[in-house]
Amino acid sequence: GRWRGWDRRGGEEMLELNRLYNMDCMEGMKQFPDKYFELAIVDPPYGIMNKTKRGGQRSPHKYKVRSEEWDYPPTADYWKELFRVSQNQIVCGGNYFTDYLFPNNAWIFWYKHQPVDNYADGEFIWTSFNDKQGKCFDYMYYGAINSETDRFHPTQKPVALYKWLLKNYAKPGDKILDTHVGSASSLIACYDMGFDFIGFEIDKDYYEAAQERMRIHMQQQT
């Protein structure tokens, strides 16, 4: 099949497509030439996971969050490298990273209808597509995500969101990059829609859970 995972910590040759790698995305992106990926769809940590987006304390037990590895906001070097290896970018929670993103009018607002786990009832998604109008993705997030039995990541996005993004912003044949895979929703969407992809997840536990989620999903497709 197209999907494979790989626990990899280094190497010189360019990484293979259609794999999820358990490694630092900064090390991974270094192995690709300029503008190799037509589109990067990323959901970096905001650095605020010890609190909800509304300011309250999160439950310390619902999800495994290790601040030293997972919940660390990207540095300026990350954004420089992301823009180097990708032609266009979509950034979930882009309003947290405006210091690094150029201003434009092509934002997406993901309307969730009701808050989830004390999170806001919507999320801003930045895109680099200056030639496109702003859009709204209206999705009954709460019922849909809680009906999934495989939710294990604190900022897990529904596969439907990524499929909508790919349908509206990607072209057939595009190679897709996700630097912080988390729950693998992005990779499942790429797999289902026939896009080549590369994913990175630095956290070993999230990596293994994402691998298992992909494996089960693929079995269900056959």
Model-assigned labels for residue ranges:
Residues 1-177, 183-222:
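Class I S-adenosyl-L-methionine-dependent methyltransferase catalytic core
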